[in-house]
């Protein structure tokens, strides 16, 4: 099982800055924009995007954290006792543009669960999606509005995102081969 680094800390910083510029441009500013990071690695990415938006627009954008554990369609498959974490959305999402943030977009099932969970908290005017990595292989008709990097992968590869807020150490994104190849 090998891994290959595809983004380092500087690449991630540049991607976040670009995503922040795109969010501000697409929404003609950030007056009614809020960010909601999907728990685990989407949450620190949302905080970083918010910091970049504040630097660009001189406006503090509200940030929340969404736990989707009980909304997943693979709940029974993943194990007997899922660990549920707190959702923290300390603002009203109704009438706002909410940008959902996650680290990797793959099948679309995590985002479907996040949409279900998010709408339990109100009725946003619109929901947009920002991801650091889009790796393809969609199973649902979901696409990201803002993408740090498109990384085509095979089904026997996965993307490992490491963020210092969650994992310690240095930021990076890696392609990890999950099965041995015959050769």
From Swiss-Prot:
Reactions performed catalytically: UMP + diphosphate = 5-phospho-alpha-D-ribose 1-diphosphate + uracil
UniProt protein name: Bifunctional protein PyrR
Similarity comment: Belongs to the purine/pyrimidine phosphoribosyltransferase family. PyrR subfamily.
EC number: 2.4.2.9
InterPro entries in the record: PRibTrfase_dom, PRTase-like, PyrR, PyrR_bifunctional
Keywords attached to this entry: Glycosyltransferase, Transcription, Transcription regulation, Transferase
UniProt xrefs under NCBIfam families: PRK05205.1-1, PRK05205.1-3, PRK05205.1-4, PRK05205.1-5
Motif interval(s): PRPP-binding: 98-110
GO molecular function, one term: uracil phosphoribosyltransferase activity
Pfam family, one: Pribosyltran
GO biological process: regulation of DNA-templated transcription
Species this protein is from: Roseiflexus sp. (strain RS-1)
Protein's UniProt keywords contain rRNA processing: no
HAMAP family: PyrR
UniProt KW Transferase keyword: yes
Primary role: Regulates the transcription of the pyrimidine nucleotide (pyr) operon in response to exogenous pyrimidines.
């Amino acid at each position: 099982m090998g891994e290959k680094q595809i983004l380092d800390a500087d690449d991630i910083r540049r991607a976040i800055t670009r995503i922040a510029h795109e969010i501000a441009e697409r929404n003609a500013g950030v007056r009614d924009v809020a960010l909601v990071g999907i728990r685990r690695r989407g949450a620190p990415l949302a905080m970083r995007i918010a910091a970049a938006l504040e630097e660009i627009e001189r406006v503090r954008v509200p940030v929340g954290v969404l736990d989707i554990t009980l909304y997943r369609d693979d709940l029974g498959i993943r194990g007997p006792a899922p660990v549920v974490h707190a959702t923290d959305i300390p603002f009203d999402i109704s009438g706002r543009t909410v940008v959902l943030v996650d680290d990797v977009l793959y099948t679309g099932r995590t985002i479907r669960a996040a949409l279900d969970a998010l709408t339990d908290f109100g009725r946003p005017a619109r929901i947009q999606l920002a991801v650091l990595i889009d790796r393809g292989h969609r199973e649902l008709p979901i696409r990201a509005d803002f993408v740090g990097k498109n990384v085509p992968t095979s089904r026997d590869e996965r993307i490992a995102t490491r963020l210092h807020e969650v994992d310690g150490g240095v930021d990076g994104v890696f392609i990890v081969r999950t099965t041995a190849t015959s050769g």
